[in-house]
């Protein structure tokens, strides 16, 4: 059994990196500790230019770099020095003049950055597939019993600190080896994803010939947290985040206080945050069981997020109990005080949490307080996944959104300016409500939300019931539907409730009947031409 605590000293290191961040200081520290440096190409030149003693790999192997750098380190004196088992292969290594290499610091050609360039064609991509680098990484990781592999510049400082303490323990080398295999796995996945989108039937294999979906789908996620249980107590669960960080999200958020996030906390917080991101003006979204139960937008000069919270809460105070609250502005102390004094809340998330808000919420130790950072106004494209038994559904993220100029007025009466503001507000909310989704809204406040019904008419009925229960007036409100109305009954019921304007995608075989129903009731109706099913 391997001794977990015995420290491995480093006498010889091979350094060959594409990302040269911190490598000069790292190599200088190694030399100061008496480590001999082997290096290649640009890394060797950089070290020598900075006065660091190093031996070029070609001089060590007696074999020059060739084929425009395609062959540099693929040599027995390199891989024998890395793979050689110190307790078994010493005689063979000595016989062939192979020196042991105790540490390998390698990172790979920037394939992802290369293929992301709009002018990248297939030959350019191929030349940026690293061969020698992954081979050294895998060799060192395989022989982690005797060799340390470093693929991340962020580990340089810790490695040096350990060497100053006498060497690297087996546990450290094992962890570095795992990082190395994760690194090469992600790298090969990127290559497979790229090549898998190439249309092989074309003569010119450039970026224009790429499809959207690769033949095999590779994506890497890193475990961020093991959870007490999953969606239900009898299910085990963990939270994995994308290896490559994107825009501000629940995955990138920092938890400032509170109990550990549960499986359902993460899912609901994601729903709340993604909804509130839809609004440019100060907004509050309250979510329960992944559905918005209250949303409001209030300009800064009319009360901002403090007023928005009051209005969102007023939509459905019962459902807000134990809910998730998201803001798109910094959480201030006054708003935080209003929340914790009024209701039980599981999670509060905002781009920034003020010191005053932190102090207020600290009195409620179990409340989970998350700070996620700012996000760009222009939403980044990406992928959504849905697991099915034996498969994975992959689609582009639903970042589609409409503006006033995109609306098609289909009724005799055009909506007023205020109705247009409310229609777009309600449409943004409906996008995040489980289908079939109906949202009633007025003055950029949700009045009633009907979610998840098999019948669209029943969703509308529930929205009306919610409004009545909250003491909110439906008369004079607008209505949003995430998909078209298949029959006129949805509009007839809306007219009876006092709805004045409707926003929906359109596209039903009976659109003319639906439009006629709206005209009969003097309801203004607009089509978006875009559906927002959410299952």
Curated annotation (Swiss-Prot):
Annotated family: Belongs to the PurH family.
PANTHER family tied to this protein: BIFUNCTIONAL PURINE BIOSYNTHESIS PROTEIN ATIC, BIFUNCTIONAL PURINE BIOSYNTHESIS PROTEIN PURH
Gene name, Swiss-Prot/TrEMBL: purH
EC number(s) reported in the record: 2.1.2.3, 3.5.4.10
Domain MGS-like as annotated: residue spans: 6-151
GO terms under cellular component: cytosol
Listed transmembrane segments: none
Recorded catalytic activity of this chain's protein: (6R)-10-formyltetrahydrofolate + 5-amino-1-(5-phospho-beta-D-ribosyl)imidazole-4-carboxamide = 5-formamido-1-(5-phospho-D-ribosyl)imidazole-4-carboxamide + (6S)-5,6,7,8-tetrahydrofolate; IMP + H2O = 5-formamido-1-(5-phospho-D-ribosyl)imidazole-4-carboxamide
Coiled coil region boundaries: none
The protein's annotated pathway: Purine metabolism; IMP biosynthesis via de novo pathway; 5-formamido-1-(5-phospho-D-ribosyl)imidazole-4-carboxamide from 5-amino-1-(5-phospho-D-ribosyl)imidazole-4-carboxamide (10-formyl THF route): step 1/1; Purine metabolism; IMP biosynthesis via de novo pathway; IMP from 5-formamido-1-(5-phospho-D-ribosyl)imidazole-4-carboxamide: step 1/1
Name of the molecule in the record: Bifunctional purine biosynthesis protein PurH
SMART domains in the cross-refs: AICARFT_IMPCHas (SM00798), MGS (SM00851)
Alphabetic keyword roster: Hydrolase, Multifunctional enzyme, Purine biosynthesis, Transferase
SUPFAM superfamilies, per database record: Cytidine deaminase-like, Methylglyoxal synthase-like
A molecular function GO annotation: IMP cyclohydrolase activity
Domain notes per entry: The IMP cyclohydrolase activity resides in the N-terminal region.
Pfam families xref list: AICARFT_IMPCHas, MGS
Listed GO biological process terms: 'de novo' IMP biosynthetic process
Organism: Pseudomonas aeruginosa (strain ATCC 15692 / DSM 22644 / CIP 104116 / JCM 14847 / LMG 12228 / 1C / PRS 101 / PAO1)
């Amino acid at each position: 059994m391997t001794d977990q605590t015995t420290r491995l000293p480093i006498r010889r290191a091979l350094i060959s990196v594409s990302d040269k961040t911190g490598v000069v200081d790292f190599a200088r520290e190694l030399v100061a500790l008496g480590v001999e440096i082997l290096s290649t190409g640009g890394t060797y030149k950089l070290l020598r230019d900075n006065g660091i003693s190093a031996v070029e790999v070609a001089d060590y192997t007696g074999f020059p770099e060739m084929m425009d750098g395609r062959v540099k380190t693929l040599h027995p004196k390199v891989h024998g020095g890395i793979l050689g088992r110190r307790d078994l292969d010493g005689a063979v290594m000595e016989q062939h003049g192979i020196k042991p290499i105790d540490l390998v610091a390698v990172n790979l050609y920037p394939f992802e950055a290369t293929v992301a360039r709009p002018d990248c064609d297939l030959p350019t991509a191929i030349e940026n597939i690293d061969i020698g680098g992954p081979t050294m990484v895998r060799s060192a990781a395989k022989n982690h019993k005797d060799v340390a592999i470093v693929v991340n510049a962020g580990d340089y400082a810790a490695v040096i600190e350990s060497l100053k303490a006498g060497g690297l323990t087996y546990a450290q080398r094992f962890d570095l080896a795992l990082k190395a295999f994760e690194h090469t796995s992600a790298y090969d996945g990127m290559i497979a994803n790229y090549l898998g989108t190439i249309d092989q039937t074309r003569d010119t294999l450039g970026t224009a010939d790429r499809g959207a979906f690769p033949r095999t789908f590779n994506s890497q996620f890193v475990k961020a947290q093991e959870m007490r249980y999953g969606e239900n107590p009898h299910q085990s669960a963990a939270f994995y985040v994308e290896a490559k960080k994107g825009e501000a999200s629940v995955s990138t958020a920092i938890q400032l206080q509170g109990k550990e996030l549960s499986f359902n906390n993460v899912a609901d917080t994601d729903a709340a945050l993604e909804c509130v991101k839809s609004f440019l003006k100060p907004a509050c979204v309250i979510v329960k069981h992944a559905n918005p139960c209250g949303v409001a937008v209030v300009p800064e000069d009319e009360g901002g997020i403090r007023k928005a919270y009051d209005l969102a809460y007023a939509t459905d105070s019962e459902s807000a109990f134990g809910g998730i609250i998201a803001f798109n502005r910094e959480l201030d102390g006054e708003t935080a005080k209003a929340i914790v004094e009024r209701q039980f809340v599981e999670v509060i998330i905002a781009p920034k949490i003020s010191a005053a808000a932190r102090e207020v919420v600290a009195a409620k130790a179990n409340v989970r307080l998350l700070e996620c950072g700012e996000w760009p106004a222009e939403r980044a494209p990406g992928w959504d996944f849905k697991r099915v038994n034996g498969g994975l559904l992959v689609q582009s993220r639903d970042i589609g959104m409409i503006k006033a100029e995109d609306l098609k007025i289909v009724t005799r009466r055009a909506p007023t300016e205020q109705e247009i503001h409310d229609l777009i507000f309600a449409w943004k909310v409906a996008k995040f409500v489980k289908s079939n989704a109906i949202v009633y809204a007025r003055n950029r406040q949700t009045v009633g939300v009907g979610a998840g019904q098999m019948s669209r008419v029943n969703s509308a009925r529930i929205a009306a019931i919610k409004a009545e229960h909250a003491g909110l007036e439906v008369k004079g409100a607008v209505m949003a539907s995430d998909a078209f109305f298949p029959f006129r009954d949805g509009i007839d019921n809306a007219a009876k409730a006092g709805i004045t304007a409707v926003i929906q995608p359109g596209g039903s075989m009976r659109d003319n009947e639906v439009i006629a129903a709206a005209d009969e009731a003097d309801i203004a109706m607009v089509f978006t031409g875009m559906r927002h099913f959410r299952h």
